[in-house]
């Protein structure tokens, strides 16, 4: 039993193995057959495509090249090299010189096969069959293909997107042009257009044809010298113009053209009294002939050239000459060939005087010049009339000399109030002064002033101070008034003279010798942006004078500047205040300014610095409120109550004094509060509590004055209060004021030293900030 079972198991295992092997054979056979079929199909496809292979560069291998897997490399951070731009000629050559027909040049059968596969190529195929030979290998030559491709490129060029236009855009542009042509009805469009169809043949003949008489006269030259005086016909110029039908209807067939003949003949140069009589003929519409006598008198000159004459004619309004009212010409009248510069009316005023003096005793007989009325036509002729006139040179007027006196001449200064600038005066001597030369030549002088002269004092050198209209009329402490005179004192030597300027102050106001040593005059000037009503006021007790110099309007350039609404209809009032300063009060200040001026004058060459002038420089201008505040220094209970506040306005340079200030006690504040105060006012921070207290205390003196201004809490309020006090302080001093208005750089160290004398110890950084914010030139250079 056991053996039978084992045999059955073995038989079953053998059947299973044979079935497995058979299935493996079948799968392998199917794979082989599939590969063979695929290879066969590939071979058939390749054989079909091989017909399109080019003879020059054929396919070397059917198997595709293995594709390499490339990993993206790191991008370079460096700058890429810019490619060189190719010229247009190189691009054109590269495009049109490349051989694009290499594929078709190998085998003609490729072209035939390609054309057969194209849809809609029946006509071309039939044409190819008809034109081909027996072998059918020739369809088109190389040159024919090139012509076909070039024609396609010419008909359908590759335009850029900017140059391409759609059909709607082209239609819109054409309609716009047609509409403009319809609306264009100007005279130029009528003139450039051809004559309308309404013109008849006779009209065209009248316009363009010439008759026999006109054709015969075409040989006559236009030169007046070649015309024979006995010729009945004169040369003329004919122009053709296109006329509109409306203008043509006004012209009658009976109208005719008229010509004028003028022959000019000159007499001998020596004959000054004989004239040539010439007859001018004119033919009117009725055929009548009128003649007028034209008398021209020729006057010879000393030179060989013919002197041209000034011709004047008077219009004859009694009759219409040459039919001027019938036909009007558009031609410009011809210029006489003999006309020269002397023939024009304005030539007499431009002739030099020496030429007139040379011909003083000559009598010039000049005929009247041709005049034409503005209301008459340009071609209307005038009948001349002979008018002899004699031009005599104008006699020189006698010189106006002042009565002779034995005293020495005292030139009077006619200059008004002048500022002490570099070019405020101009000294003119007797030998080089153009004013005196013009007086001698009687040519007129711009200076309305006559200096007394005498025969005895003619040898002395005189110096005259001439004022200019461009000079300023504002007065300062150094101003010279009109009543001042120059006293000329002679010494034994005639070449040396000493001048002494006499003061213009009245005798009652002149200080004595002792007073001159003890008192000093100080002048200040305010510019108030308003029409400030003020009366001149003199206070002898307190020693100050107040006057209003001028009120000038504020001129705004409307083209380059936008006017502020607050500045409309306002004027600029200029007020001058002069006061006497006691020597005891200003002795220290005066000595300091004198020494400072000497130092600056001595080091003017070494300390010269070149700085940029600020873009918005302006003189120190104070408002109405600033001047009203200054009244407190000059207020007096003895003044009349009916006087206005404006009449008491004056300048007090010492209004800000440290003695009257009520400073804030910053020592009671903590360090944190002091730092906050620095931040609010944007001051430069310093180290140390004592240093912070010192800086704030000195700065606070400028706004804690007698006016009890509130302590500012913001930067704008701080700058407005402190800068206003500094402006009044600096503007009260003539030295610093002149430096500011002349844009001279301010040395911050010197300005700080001067302010320290007034009781304010400010930092240089703060003064630099003050100058920069106000547009003042400043420098730290010592």
UniProtKB/Swiss-Prot annotation:
One term under GO cellular component: Slx1-Slx4 complex
Region (Disordered): 63-91, 359-425
UniProt PTM comment: Phosphorylated in response to DNA damage.
GO BP term, pick one: DNA replication
Cellular localization per UniProt: Nucleus
Matching InterPro entries: Slx4_ascomycetes, Structure-sp_endonuc_su_Slx4
Gene Ontology MF terms: 5'-flap endonuclease activity
Keywords in alphabetical order: DNA damage, DNA recombination, DNA repair, Nucleus, Phosphoprotein
Comp. bias intervals (Polar residues): 374-388
Basic residues: compositionally biased ranges: 73-84
Pfam families xref list: Slx4
Family stated for the protein in its record: Belongs to the SLX4 family.
Complex formation: Forms a heterodimer with SLX1.
HAMAP family in UniProt: Endonuc_su_Slx4
Function noted in UniProt: Regulatory subunit of the SLX1-SLX4 structure-specific endonuclease that resolves DNA secondary structures generated during DNA repair and recombination. Has endonuclease activity towards branched DNA substrates, introducing single-strand cuts in duplex DNA close to junctions with ss-DNA.
Protein name: Structure-specific endonuclease subunit SLX4
Organism the protein comes from: Scheffersomyces stipitis (strain ATCC 58785 / CBS 6054 / NBRC 10063 / NRRL Y-11545)
């Amino acid at each position: 039993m056991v053996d039978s079972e084992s045999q059955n198991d073995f038989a079953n295992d053998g059947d299973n193995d044979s079935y497995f092997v058979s299935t493996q054979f079948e799968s392998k056979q199917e794979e082989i057959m599939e590969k063979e079929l695929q290879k066969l199909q590939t071979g058939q496809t390749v054989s079909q495509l091989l017909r399109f292979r080019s003879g020059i560069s054929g396919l070397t291998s059917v198997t595709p090249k293995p594709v390499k897997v490339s990993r993206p490399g790191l991008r370079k951070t460096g700058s890429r090299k810019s490619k060189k731009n190719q010229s247009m000629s190189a691009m054109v050559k590269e495009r049109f010189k490349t051989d694009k027909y290499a594929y078709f040049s190998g085998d003609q059968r490729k072209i035939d096969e390609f054309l057969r596969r194209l849809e809609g190529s029946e006509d071309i195929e039939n044409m190819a069959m008809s034109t081909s030979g027996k072998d059918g290998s020739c369809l088109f030559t190389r040159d024919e293909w090139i012509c076909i491709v070039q024609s396609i490129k010419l008909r359908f060029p590759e335009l850029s997107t900017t140059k391409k236009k759609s059909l709607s855009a082209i239609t819109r542009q054409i309609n716009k042009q047609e509409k403009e042509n319809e609306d264009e009805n100007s005279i130029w469009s009528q003139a450039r257009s051809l004559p309308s169809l309404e013109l008849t043949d006779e009209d065209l003949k009248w316009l363009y044809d010439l008759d026999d008489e006109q054709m015969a006269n075409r040989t006559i030259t236009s030169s007046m010298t070649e015309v024979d005086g006995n010729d009945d016909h004169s040369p003329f110029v004919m122009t053709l113009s296109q006329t509109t039908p409306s203008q043509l209807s006004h012209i009658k067939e009976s109208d005719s053209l008229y010509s004028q003949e003028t022959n000019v003949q000159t007499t001998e140069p020596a004959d000054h009294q004989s004239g040539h009589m010439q007859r001018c003929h004119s033919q009117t519409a009725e055929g009548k002939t009128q003649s007028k006598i034209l008398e021209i008198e020729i006057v010879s000159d000393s030179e060989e050239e013919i002197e041209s004459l000034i011709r004047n004619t008077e219009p004859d309004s009694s009759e219409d000459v040459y039919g001027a009212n019938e036909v009007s010409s558009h031609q410009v009248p011809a210029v006489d060939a003999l006309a020269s510069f002397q023939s024009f009316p304005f030539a007499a005023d431009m002739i030099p005087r020496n030429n007139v003096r040379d011909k003083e005793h000559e009598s010039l007989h000049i005929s009247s010049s041709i005049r034409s009325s503005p209301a008459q036509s340009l071609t209307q002729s005038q009948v001349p009339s002979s008018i002899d006139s004699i031009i005599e040179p104008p006699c020189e007027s006698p010189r106006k000399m002042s009565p002779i006196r034995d005293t020495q001449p005292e030139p009077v200064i006619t200059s008004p109030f002048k500022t002490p600038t570099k070019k405020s005066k101009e000294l003119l001597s007797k030998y080089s002064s153009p004013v005196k030369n013009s007086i001698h030549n009687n040519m007129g002088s711009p200076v309305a002033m006559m200096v007394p002269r005498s025969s005895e004092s003619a040898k002395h050198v005189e110096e005259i101070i001439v004022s200019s209209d461009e000079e300023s009329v504002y007065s300062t402490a150094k101003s010279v008034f009109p009543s001042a005179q120059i006293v000329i004192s002679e010494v034994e030597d005639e070449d040396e003279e000493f001048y002494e300027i006499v003061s213009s102050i009245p005798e009652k106001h002149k200080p004595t010798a002792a007073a001159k040593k003890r008192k000093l005059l100080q002048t200040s000037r305010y510019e108030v942006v308003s029409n400030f009503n003020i009366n001149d006021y003199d206070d002898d007790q307190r020693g100050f004078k107040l006057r209003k110099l001028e009120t000038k309007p504020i001129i705004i350039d409307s083209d380059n500047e936008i006017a502020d609404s607050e500045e409309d209809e306002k004027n600029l009032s200029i007020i001058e205040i002069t006061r006497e300063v006691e020597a005891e009060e200003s002795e220290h200040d005066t000595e300091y300014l004198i020494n400072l001026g000497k130092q600056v004058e001595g080091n003017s060459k070494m300390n010269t610095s070149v700085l940029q002038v600020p873009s918005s420089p302006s003189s120190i201008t104070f408002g109405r409120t600033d001047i009203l505040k200054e009244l407190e220094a000059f207020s007096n209970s003895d003044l009349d109550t009916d006087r206005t506040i404006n009449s008491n306005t004056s300048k007090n340079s010492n209004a800000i004094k440290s003695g009257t200030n009520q400073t804030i006690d910053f020592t009671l504040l903590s360090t944190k509060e002091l730092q906050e105060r620095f931040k609010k006012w944007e001051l430069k921070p310093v180290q140390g509590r004592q240093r912070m207290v010192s800086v704030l205390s000195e700065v606070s003196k400028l706004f804690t004055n007698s006016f009890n201004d509130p302590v500012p809490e913001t930067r704008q309020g701080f700058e407005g209060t402190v800068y206003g006090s500094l402006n009044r302080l600096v503007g009260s001093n003539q030295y610093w004021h002149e430096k500011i208005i002349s844009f001279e750089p301010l040395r911050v160290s010197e300005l700080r030293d001067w302010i320290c004398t007034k009781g304010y110890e400010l930092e240089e950084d703060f003064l630099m900030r003050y100058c920069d914010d106000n547009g003042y030139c400043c420098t730290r250079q010592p």
